[in-house]
Amino acid sequence: MAVPRANTSKARTRRRRAVNMRLEAPHLVECGNCGNFVQSHRVCGRCGFYRGRQVINPDDLC
């Protein structure tokens, strides 16, 4: 006769999920204008440059 499977505890379930749902650190590159680290394909928050030209005024950010 078949034996019922044991219940999976909350800790075991959460430990298994934690491995697969791990957050990765964002990929940072150095800004070509000021040297600040920013995410790829984003405007630099310190100087306002993106792809070699200024797209926003950094004084307007604050």
Curated annotation (Swiss-Prot):
GO MF annotation, one: structural constituent of ribosome
Gene Ontology CC, one term: large ribosomal subunit
Alphabetical list of Pfam families matching this protein: Ribosomal_L32p (PF01783)
Domain of life: Bacteria
Keywords tagged on the record: Ribonucleoprotein, Ribosomal protein
SUPFAM superfamilies linked to this entry: Zn-binding ribosomal proteins
One Gene Ontology term from the biological process aspect of the record: translation
Database matches in HAMAP family: Ribosomal_bL32 (MF_00340)
Family per similarity comment: Belongs to the bacterial ribosomal protein bL32 family.
Protein name: Large ribosomal subunit protein bL32
Name of the gene: rpmF
